[in-house]
């Protein structure tokens, strides 16, 4: 079916899994546009409370009773086929649309759609580009997979033709989009519960590039060989970025005491400007370059680019400073893939401190199993790893892999690693181990952040 964002405002739309960061953003867009919205999720959250206050009917738990008076049901790729609401909608011919198709239909109403894809960095790049376009008064609509202070959440309703969103490759979701500008930050082995291998993933990114019209643009990181190949085959305009041999490059790079980079931005051999980022880490130089490329396509003033990037605080859970207690600094990061973990720990090295305690919570059994060897090589920059049980998310424990297995493998490679089985057990270990001027990182896409929050609240 199709959905017309302008003409279908008399419809009531129900979201299965409305508490998710992307689904809640879509629901909020509809609520702000006058739609009747309902949704269900398996547990209460701050996101659900906000949606209630905005007028949504929220149900805790999934039941066919929740959708008896709705016109359209939207669901995510993570919703299982045996979900009672999904079954009822199919049996009773209620219109169904997955999240990606629904977002794609909303995008149809905009001319300058920017879809930011890649295994890592999507939210940060979207955050940077959001800052720039807001500084430039482009008045974009924004949907992002994280909370941004500058827009007060994970969405913004604009009144222009500019639409900025993340584009996830999971279950080929981004193939439902209509990009005018497509960004490929990187390609990596992930979501192997769905894809056969990295070659199939790369093929899907190539299909994403093919969605861009001939007068549109594909932007990609030249240092990733798979992205480089897709750029070379693109039928649309292309713009590459990287540290060398790219259209847009960063040169003369230095880092300050907070781990934030200063560098000169060049297009070919012409220096455009210099800037200092407020987001730490070498990987954020690349994220910044990707957002600069988009900005150049839209002829954004250099001063707005510089201001947008220098003031960008990034999204929550992206190397997010949470606080300090007893001289121990606590930082939370969403990293859940070995490449991301390495980047996070590398960033931490640029900040003056004594020991780094990395509290890591593996995310899904499939990812832990398929990338097991890569995980065992991801923690060498941590002084100590506190390893929590695997966060199941959408999966069930098959008994094929556990955090204990990962702990054994890490210790065999010389990593100091302690397995814990609850937030409180992790907290007690850290209270007895962390000392003034140490750095405590909570790392993962589950609920590991609770450990850091409890650590900061000790004694209160």
Curated annotation (Swiss-Prot):
Its main location: cytoplasm. Keywords: ATP-binding, Cell cycle, Cell division, Cell shape, Cell wall biogenesis/degradation, Cytoplasm, Ligase, Nucleotide-binding, Peptidoglycan synthesis. It catalyses: UDP-N-acetyl-alpha-D-muramate + L-alanine + ATP = UDP-N-acetyl-alpha-D-muramoyl-L-alanine + ADP + phosphate + H(+). GO terms for cellular component: cytoplasm. ATP binds at residues 118-124. Pfam families: Mur_ligase (PF01225), Mur_ligase_C (PF02875), Mur_ligase_M (PF08245). Cell wall formation. NCBIfam families: murC. This is UDP-N-acetylmuramate--L-alanine ligase. It comes from Clostridium botulinum (strain Alaska E43 / Type E3).
